[in-house]
């Protein structure tokens, strides 16, 4: 099935200490009837990010040195953030794949179709990813929805971060329940999109210097 859904990725570098951040933004097919298409898109995205991450993580000889002589040299450290409108709820195969880092070849979301290695040996990626809005012991998503329309309300948009390089310091609450009770869906005069914003404040860390702020990232995940 030919789709025009896209993903973009960029490499950010902190001027002070050289810490690198790979940020990707992606959009998966919207139709809930095609969970298999979204799985394939997720697999392709993570394969490409794995290649880019490996390429961009290498410390080049011509790479600028940290601008501060007193700052630790973290130019060899790289973190990952993936902002994605998955059009998939937390009980989907796409969510399981990104969260667990692997998915079996016979997962029902493939719908019995054959997709080469994905349905022969399964899918996997090397990143330890967590959803920024899935906090606490249960790991459940704390927002009741990220998309709110008269016909649908649910969590389908996510900010995934690599736990080996980032930790979440704060996230913003969703719309107040009292307000939601009086509207049938978005957009409306106060919310210009059916997707709500998901600002996330993250902290980078180095294994030997925990809790030291090197970078404050304000990510806004917005649906298409």
Regions found by a protein language model. Give the residues of each.
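Metal-dependent phosphoester-hydrolase catalytic domains
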Residues: 2, 11-13, 52-81, 86-224
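Alpha-helical scaffold elements lining the catalytic groove of polysaccharide deacetylases
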Residues: 38-49, 168
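Residues at alpha-helix caps and immediate loop-helix transition turns in enzyme cores, especially N-
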Residues: 34-41, 93-94
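Short glycine/proline-rich turn/loop motifs
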Residues: 25-28, 181-183
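Beta-strand-turn-beta hairpins that frame and shape the catalytic cleft
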Residues: 3-27
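Active-site environment of divalent metal-dependent phosphoester hydrolases
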Residues: 30-34, 88-91
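Alpha-helical elements of Rossmann-like donor-binding domains used by nucleotide-donor carbohydrate transfer enzymes
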Residues: 7-9, 40, 44, 97
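Short interface patches used for recognition in eukaryotic signaling and trafficking proteins
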Residues: 27-33, 81-83
């Amino acid at each position: 099935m030919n789709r025009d859904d896209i993903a973009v990725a960029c490499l950010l570098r902190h001027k002070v200490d050289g810490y690198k951040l790979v940020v990707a933004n992606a959009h998966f097919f919207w139709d809930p009837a095609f969970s298999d298409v979204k799985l394939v898109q997720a697999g392709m995205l993570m394969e490409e990010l794995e290649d880019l991450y490996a390429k961009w993580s290498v410390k080049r000889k011509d790479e600028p040195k940290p601008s501060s002589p007193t700052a630790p040299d973290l130019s060899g450290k790289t973190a990952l953030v993936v902002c994605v409108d998955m059009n998939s709820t937390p009980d989907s195969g796409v969510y399981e794949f990104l969260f667990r880092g692997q998915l079996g070849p016979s997962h029902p979301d493939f719908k019995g179709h054959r997709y080469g290695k994905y349905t022969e040996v399964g899918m996997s990626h090397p990143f330890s990813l967590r959803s920024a809005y899935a906090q606490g012991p249960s790991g459940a998503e704390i927002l009741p929805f990220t998309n709110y329309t008269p016909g649908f309300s649910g969590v389908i948009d996510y900010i995934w971060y690599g736990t080996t390089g980032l930790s979440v310091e704060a996230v913003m609450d969703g719309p107040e329940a009292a307000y939601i009770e009086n509207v049938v869906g978005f957009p409306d005069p106060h919310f210009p999109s059916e997707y709500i914003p998901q600002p996330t404040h993250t902290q980078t860390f180095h294994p030997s210097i925990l809790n030291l702020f090197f970078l404050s990232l304000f990510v806004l995940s917005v649906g298409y």
